Amino acid sequence: MTLSKEVVLEALRCCRDVYPHTEDFLVSRKVAGHTILAVEGTNETTDWITNLKFLIKRDDCHRGFKNNANRTLAQLVVAYEGLNPERKLVIAGHSLGGATATLIADLLWESGNKNIALVTAGSPRPGGRRLRRRIKDLCHLRFVHGDDIVPGTPPWLAGYVHTHPVVKLKDENDTRFDGVADHNIGSYYDAAVKYYESKKVAL
């Protein structure tokens, strides 16, 4: 399964635009045949990295991320009375929203909904190896921009892993280590536009 440039950039745009949104998520149907669900994350790294509790307790997933996934999915069902199964659902998220999006995808995938895909930007590791095995066949574009430090958390020594290979986005202003600045979702979106301009093809 592949995702077009149009779908991926719309997903990342929604990840950017969800921050000032009143809800914890943003839904877009601008791309024909697709529904894009963007989950709110955070642009602030220092507050939550220092306080993050590195616990895998339920279904091999970080408990906090899993709670966010359950809450967001419940809100979505109430707000939209379900989703059109004929449209591909692309779940997207930046930062903590990326981890939440991954676990929403896990919930839907395990329930038998295979008409989904995942786009994440600067996501921390969401869980352990059992989670990775469960969704290994899910289409997931996992973007990391420059020196972004968030994808390196929680530590792999605590049993945390990423579920899919990385797609690296170049930092055009990479004159120093700027792992916090590189986490900004606006920088992710701009770098993705340049990435696709250089590729001229869909992933």
Residue ranges and their predicted role:
Residues 1-92, 96-203:
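Non-catalytic, mobile gating and regulatory segments of ester bond hydrolases
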